[in-house]
Design a protein with these regions (language model features):
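N-terminal alpha-helical scaffold/docking segments in eukaryotic complex subunits
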Residues: 1-89, 93-98, 246-289
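Amphipathic alpha-helical repeat scaffolds
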Residues: 21, 37, 52-56, 113-114, ...
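Residue-level signature of alpha-solenoid helical repeat scaffolds
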Residues: 53, 90-93, 130-131, 165-168, ...
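Hydrophobic alpha-helical segments and helix pairs
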Residues: 86, 90-139
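Extended alpha-helical scaffolding segments
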Residues: 172, 176, 184-265, 273
Length: 289
C-alpha cells in the first residue's frame, strides 16, 4: 500500500478539539462520532487518513480517559459504505499511537490491532495497515522487532494480507535491517497459501493474501538481497499454480523496475524449468478430450 502523509498528527480544527475534549470529560462520544463521520470523506475512494491519524493520536495521548471511546469506536459495526466506518479506522490509529517500549503492552496492542486487521471492511484493513507502518519504529526492538512480531500473522488468511501490507510499506522497509525477519514473514505467507486445503482456495482472506504477496515481495526484494535470493529459491520449489503465478508477477515487476537482475533471472529460469510438461494428446484415452 502506498505510504500516506501522516507526519502531521496535531489536531488543527478548534471545533474538533472542543468536541474531543467534551467527549473525554463526559465519556459521551456521540458528538465526536458525528463530527468525525462528517469529516471522513466517506463514502468515497479517499478516506481522510490524516484526520484519522490525528484523532487517534489525540485519543492515545489522553490515556485512560479515552480508553472507553477507543473500545467503542473499535467495536462499531458500521457498514463499509457509510461514514461511520471511519470510527474503527480512528481506533486503529489510536491503538497504534499507544505502542511504546513496554513489550507486554505493545504485544497486547498488537493483538487488538490484529483483531481489527481481520475486519471484512476494506477501509478498516487499510487503516490498520497504515497505522501499523506508522507505529513500527516505536515497537520494542524498533522496526526489526515489529517485523518479527508480525511473522505469526502471515500464517493467517485473516491477518496475513494486512501484515504484508504493513511490512511492504516503504517506511518499514527503509528502516529494516533484519533481512531474515523479512524473509520469515514472506515465507510464512507463501507457505500459508501453498498449504491451504482446496476448499479454502476461494476464501476471500486467501485471495487478499495472494494479491498482497507480489506487491510486498517486489518492494522487499528491491530493498533486501536476502529476499531476492529467497525469490530465486522459492521459484525452483513451488508447485502451487496460484503461487507460481504470483512469483512470475514478482519477476515481471522487478524486470520493469530494473531491479535485482541476477536473482530475477534465476527465478525466471527456475520457473520455466519447473513447469509441468504439456500433456501428450496421444496418451489421452477416448472420451477424455
Amino acid at each position: 500500500m502506498p505510504a500516506t502523509v501522516l507526519a502531521v498528527t496535531e489536531i488543527r480544527s478548534e471545533a474538533l478539539r472542543a468536541t474531543l475534549d467534551s467527549a473525554l470529560r463526559s465519556g459521551d462520544a456521540r458528538d465526536l462520532s458525528a463530527f468525525l463521520a462528517r469529516s471522513s470523506h466517506l463514502p468515497g475512494p479517499r478516506p481522510n487518513l490524516e484526520l484519522a491519524a490525528a484523532a487517534g493520536a489525540a485519543l492515545a495521548a489522553a490515556g485512560r480517559p479515552a480508553a472507553g471511546i477507543v473500545r467503542e469506536f473499535a467495536s462499531l459495526d458500521a457498514d463499509d459504505g457509510t461514514p461511520y466506518v471511519f470510527l474503527p479506522m480512528v481506533a486503529a490509529y489510536a491503538l497504534a499511537a499507544a505502542i511504546g517500549p513496554d513489550a507486554r503492552a505493545a504485544a497486547r496492542i498488537l493483538e487488538e490491532l490484529g483483531e481489527l486487521g481481520e475486519d471484512e471492511r476494506s477501509v478498516v484493513r487499510r487503516a490498520v495497515e497504515d497505522a501499523l507502518a506508522t507505529a513500527a519504529p516505536h515497537y520494542p526492538g524498533g522496526v526489526d522487532g515489529f517485523v518479527s512480531a508480525l511473522v505469526p500473522w502471515c500464517s493467517s488468511f485473516e491477518r496475513g494480507s494486512v501484515a504484508l501490507g504493513a511490512i511492504g510499506d516503504r517506511r518499514v522497509l527503509d528502516a529494516a535491517h533484519d533481512e531474515a525477519a523479512l524473509v520469515a514473514a514472506i515465507d510464512a505467507a507463501t507457505a500459508t497459501l501453498e498449504d491451504a486445503p482446496r476448499a479454502k482456495e476461494r476464501d476471500p482472506g486467501r485471495r487478499r493474501l495472494l494479491d498482497a504477496l507480489p506487491r510486498t515481495v517486489t518492494a522487499a526484494a528491491t530493498a533486501s538481497r536476502q529476499v531476492a535470493e529467497w525469490l530465486a529459491e522459492r521459484a525452483a520449489t513451488s508447485r502451487h499454480a496460484d503461487v507460481r503465478r504470483a512469483l512470475e508477477e514478482i519477476v515481471t515487476r522487478l524486470r520493469t523496475k530494473g531491479e535485482r537482475k541476477t536473482e530475477r533471472t534465476a527465478a525466471a529460469t527456475a520457473l520455466d524449468a519447473s513447469k509441468k510438461p504439456p500433456r501428450d494428446p496421444t496418451l489421452l484415452r477416448e472420451g477424455m478430450r
